[in-house]
């Protein structure tokens, strides 16, 4: 893909694309809720919306996203015991590149789909992938490993040089 200029999608829209791929062709319209107190949700909030793309095409994309985590630009998202699928993105602009990652897990029983977008963060693997890894691990395991706690601290202490032109 070609990534020049600014991205016109929101992170929520990118995450919903990831959910559509993870679910092999359907998504649930995102909603913002304050809380759910044990009452049955209106079906409006859980209605599956299907694309017109054959499931077999999604299976191919999922395999590619898994391969990216096992040996491609998303290697940093690989977690023990969790089959993570992902795609990096690098958007060139007037300043430093933007770092993006879209992913979901587990591959065959998806529970989480995420998007990470860090303006001026560099290549997708620099910020997007490690932040995505931490989010997936925390959500699915409830806590980070000691190594990933250290990674989280290191990422929090990084400094992004906004607006610095690299080309």
Which residues does each PLM region occupy?
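Active-site beta-strand/loop architecture of penicillin-binding DD-peptidases
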Residues: 1-50, 56, 62-146
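Gram-negative outer-membrane assembly/targeting C-terminal domains
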Residues: 140-167
């Amino acid at each position: 893909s070609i990534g020049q200029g600014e991205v016109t999608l929101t992170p929520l829209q990118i995450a919903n694309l990831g959910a559509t791929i993870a679910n092999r062709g359907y998504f649930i319209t995102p909603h913002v809720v304050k809380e759910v107190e044990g009452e049955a949700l209106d079906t409006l909030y859980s209605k599956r919306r299907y694309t017109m793309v054959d499931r077999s095409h999604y299976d191919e994309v999922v395999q590619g996203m898994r391969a990216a985590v096992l040996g491609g630009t998303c290697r940093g998202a690989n977690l023990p015991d969790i089959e993570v699928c992902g795609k990096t993105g690098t958007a060139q602009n007037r300043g430093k590149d933007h770092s993006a990652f879209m992913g979901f897990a587990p591959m065959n029983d998806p529970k989480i789909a995420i998007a990470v977008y860090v303006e001026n963060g560099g290549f997708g693997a620099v910020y997007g992938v490690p932040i995505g890894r931490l989010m997936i691990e925390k959500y699915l395991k409830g806590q980070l490993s000691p190594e990933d706690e250290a990674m989280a601290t290191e990422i929090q202490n990084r400094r992004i040089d906004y607006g610095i032109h690299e080309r």
